[in-house]
Amino acid sequence: MTFILRVRQICTKIHKLLNYSAIILLGLPQNFFMLDLIEFLEPVPLHELNDDKGYTDGQLAKHIKIYEEELPDLENIDIVLLGITETRGNGYFEAENNAANIIRKHLYQLHYWHNDIQIADFGNVKKGATIKDSYAGIKTVLAELIRHKKTVILFGGSHDITLAQYEAYIELNQQIEATGIDAMIDLRGDSPIRSHNFLMDMLTNEPSMVKHYNHIAFQSYFVHPRMLETMDKLRFDCYRVGTVTENIEEMEPVLRNSHLLSFDISAIKYSDAPANKNCPNGLTGVEACILTRYAGLSNLLSSFGIYGYRPQDDVEELTAKQISQMIWYFIDGKNRCKKETDLKESHNFNEYHTAFTEVDTVFLQSKKTNRWWMQMPDKSFIACSHGDYIKASNNEIPERWLRVQERN
């Protein structure tokens, strides 16, 4: 593993000397610097997923470039699937974990509706000798894929894998807005379980690449009030599950602004995700799919992880089916996102001028997707909702506007 990481460091230095545009001009394949990644990956056992029964032409498996013997070429690929097998961070020792392949089995059976979206499956990231080795492997693979402008969906593994997901952006020296969807806020410093406290490192360690953090669907009885006070002092935004379910469309701008999304299945109630034994309440399966579709609509989001699935706790693999459908809806959102145009193309937007408390501002509404943007005092535009426009029209300060101003 150390040798491979050294090779990776050398490739990174080459990247700085020979940028991506130069690679294209020289006619090199997009995965020219990705030859070492195969050392971190396990191929997809396709014959095991379908019992050698094959797939019909309409199913996803027929339209995905799958790593069976050779890594797929990244040319024209929009989304890369990446299975995670590392689960030691959840406090359980599991010699083998097949969560990713069970999710993959059900995903492959779904029907393909999105001809404009090209997908590759890079298999599973190998588990390292230690949990830190696993983090390093995930970080390395993810950083390389993001560097090549790919959107990566990670699935399987414990929720602390979010930290490795985040470390990919540190390697890329990219500041991000991160969003977590979880019934709990994993800042429990008194817990020895990594998946309970990883946010502490992510939000406080240096160098920090998190310019803002959102937490969606927390359940109040799982969160100490002082923890919320701390999050608020840091100007991070936290949304109770009740707030989310009452007005779920308000979460779309939150996810549209995000670069990293981490979804713990503990946010979904037990009846819709029976592998989540600790939460009788929470999001419904439909609401989870709506949120992941919103995430797919973001043209900023480059990594999306779904964590916390333990097959041994599942019933009839219903949770795996739920996760596979959440991934399907993310792809659906990405397909819709491709139809959005740049804000500079003013003819594709309705423009509304308004003022609140003596502040003049502009709202833009997309003619293609009906999404909204709001102009800030520095003339930049941020994602917002129709509700923000209604408040501004009534001479009220939209809370989203105020929170962004506080952070600037």
Positions of the model-derived regions?
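Basic polycationic patches enriched in arginine
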Residues: 6-8
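Conserved alpha-helical scaffold segments that buttress catalytic/binding sites
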Residues: 35-81, 88-408
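Short, Lys/Arg-enriched N-terminal segments with co-localized hydrophobic residues
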Residues: 17-33
